[in-house]
Amino acid sequence: MQINVKYRAHLAELVKNSNESILAANVSEVLNHIKKQYGAQALKLAKTMLIVVNGQSILLQKHFKTVLKDGDEVSFLPICGGG
């Protein structure tokens, strides 16, 4: 499936990219792409971010096994805290 990936904050700076289209069937394959294309440090950072598919957190779905469809958007967003 052709997936649109959006990188934000420190991850975008690290990979020197904010958007790309890749082939992936689930979120785990997106993470594998990040490791192969950008290295272990990028993968480690990506796993600490909020990962959303079409605006919905993967925590509400099947986490890294969340199935993707053609045209889906996977975004890596910084987790913000407040008080």
Predicted regions, residues:
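Ubiquitin-like/PB1-type beta-grasp interaction modules and other compact soluble beta-rich domains
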Residues: 1-82
